[in-house]
Structure formats: structure tokens, C-alpha cells
Amino acid sequence: MTVITRILPVLVYFLVLLPPAYGSETRWIDSVSATVGKDNNSNNTDIYRLGLQNKWNRTWFNGGAWFVGGYWDVSLAYWDSDNDNNGSLYDLSLTPILRLQRDAELSHSVSPFSEVGVGGHLLSEREIGERDLSTNFQFGSHLGVGLGFGDKGRYELMYRYQHVSNGNIKSPNQAINLHLVSFGYAFE
């Protein structure tokens, strides 16, 4: 089975979910993102992720050109390993994220940012490649840096370093570290 046919259920999920969530008066999807990445272990795992974001209606320390805000990130990912056994899995995650960001309107529509997030991941399998993650529930923590650009920072390009592990709920805890690059689009 090719990567495209494995990712198809992920695409269908988001295409079905997106129109009603974006089109309503009480819209709960503010932006979407597409992410690709690799692990930095000897696992040779590729990651393909689609995400939906909902910004919090609150900011802090917003007296100057920089502010702290946050958002919820819901994503569905497909992990593909070179290993014939335990070669793939799906990952559904929910992560609250804090972001330090420059106001795009004060910086000619260019908005650098950094962010941190810790959330829960539900994996379809407990093993990927040679790694035994022990549980289907995992914690994901990440640090990210990026740049918003375009009209009001509508587009985003971001790098994330993400650590996924079971938090020593069960042994073994063979965590995995990921290098991810994302492109995002904000609806407003």
C-alpha cells in the first residue's frame, strides 16, 4: 500500500469536518496546517499530519509589539516507518499551545513567533519500527519557532521539535523525537 492510499482516510476526515466548522457563525476552526517530518532516531519514520487550530480569545502582555496568546491544536497524523513489521500507525492528538508572537500589524505583515505545547496523543498502534512505545496513549511536548507572513500574518511557516513518550506510565518507554515543518493558513 502506498503512502497516499494510507493518508486518504486522514484527508477525508478533514474534508468532511472542515466546511461545517468554518462556515458557521460560531466557527471553531481559525486555521489549518499541514506538517511533514522525520524522527531523529534510527527508526526512519516519516510523519504526515493535518491539523485544525482554535485560537483562544485571550492574550497576555500585549502592551507593546509582542504578546502571548494561545490556541488548541487538534491533529491527525500518519507515521510511516521503513520497518516491515510495525511499519505504520495513526496519531490523533489534542494540544494546548502557548505562543509568544510579534503583532503582524506593527511589523509590516511579518510576525516571528515561538511556542511551546504539551498534549495528549492516541496512537493506533503501540509499536513503530523497532520502537516499543508500550501504550496507545502518549504525551507530546514540543518547542517551535516560525514566521507568520502575508496579510495580517495569515500564512505561517514553522519548525517544531517534538518529543512523544508515555511519560513512564508503563515500561519500556522508548520515546521518539521528531523534526517537523508546518505550513499553516488562517481564515481571518
PLM features: residue spans?
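Transmembrane beta-barrel outer-membrane domains
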Residues: 27, 41-49, 65, 85-93, ...
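Short loop/turn motifs that connect adjacent beta-strands in outer-membrane beta-barrel proteins
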Residues: 21-29, 57-68, 103-112, 151-154, ...
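Transmembrane beta-strands of outer-membrane beta-barrel proteins
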Residues: 28-34, 66-74, 112-118, 155-159, ...
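Extracellular loop and loop/strand-boundary signature of outer-membrane beta-barrel proteins
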Residues: 36-38, 82-86, 127-133, 166-171
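Outer-membrane beta-barrel "beta-signal"
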Residues: 48-52, 175-188
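Transmembrane beta-barrel domains of outer membrane proteins
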Residues: 53-57, 97-103, 146-148, 184-186
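Transmembrane beta-strands of outer-membrane beta-barrel pores
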Residues: 36-42, 54, 74-80, 100, ...
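Cleavable N-terminal export/targeting peptides
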Residues: 1-27, 188
